[in-house]
């Protein structure tokens, strides 16, 4: 088994506490509301929403994937860090055992946020993950993030 790590970073004008509430803590409700074409629904299969919780994410029509199952590995509300593993679903091919993600929000000097994301692809055997495959997924995640940011800018009294 190999592990391939990819890191990305982008910025937002939204401060970390507000962004964490919307983009992380309430994503299961907010994203299907503002982007049903991307995520149809999210449901807890097991757990209470905290560490160890298993969630099924069903994607919208037109998505290349039907659904995935996430396991929450960590939530640090004080330091705005969230980690989870994608453990099941059609996004995991016969080459990937699991994908672990960590998202950390830090305050930027202008009052907004710097979003740091790390993805660890745990492969089966000696398979290598192509960077363009990862970039396509990151672009979709970045698009969802921009939708959340736009929603927060348009609704300044939500997630305060």
From Swiss-Prot:
One of its GO terms (molecular function) is protein phosphatase inhibitor activity. Pfam families: Bet_v_1 (PF00407). The keyword Lipid biosynthesis does not apply. Phosphorylated in vivo. Phosphorylation prevents its activity as ribonuclease. InterPro entries: Bet_v_I/MLP, Bet_v_I_allergen, Plant_def-hormone_signal, START-like_dom_sf. The keyword GTP-binding does not apply. Gene3D superfamilies: 3.30.530.20. It is an enzyme of class 3 (hydrolase). Keywords: Allergen, Hydrolase, Nuclease, Pathogenesis-related protein, Phosphoprotein, Plant defense. SUPFAM superfamilies: Bet v1-like. Its EC number is 3.1.27.-. One of its GO terms (cellular component) is cytoplasm. GO terms for biological process: abscisic acid-activated signaling pathway; defense response. Possesses ribonuclease activity in vitro. Belongs to the BetVI family. This is Major strawberry allergen Fra a 1.05. It comes from Fragaria ananassa (Strawberry).
């Amino acid at each position: 088994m190999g592990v391939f790590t990819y890191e990305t970073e982008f910025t937002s004008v939204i401060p970390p506490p507000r962004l964490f509430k919307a983009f992380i803590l309430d994503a299961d409700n907010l994203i299907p509301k503002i982007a049903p074409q991307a995520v149809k629904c999210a449901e807890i299969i097991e757990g209470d929403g905290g560490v160890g919780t298993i969630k099924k994410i069903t994607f919208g029509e037109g998505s290349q994937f039907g659904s995935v199952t996430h396991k929450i590995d960590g939530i640090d509300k004080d330091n705005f860090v969230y980690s989870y593993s994608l453990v099941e679903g059609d996004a995991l091919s016969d080459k990937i055992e699991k994908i672990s993600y960590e998202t950390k929000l830090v305050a930027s000097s202008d009052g907004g946020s710097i979003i740091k994301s790390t993805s660890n692809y745990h492969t089966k055997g000696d398979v290598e993950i192509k960077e363009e495959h990862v970039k396509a997924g990151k672009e979709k995640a970045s698009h969802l993030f921009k939708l959340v940011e736009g929603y927060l800018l348009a609704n300044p009294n939500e997630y305060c």
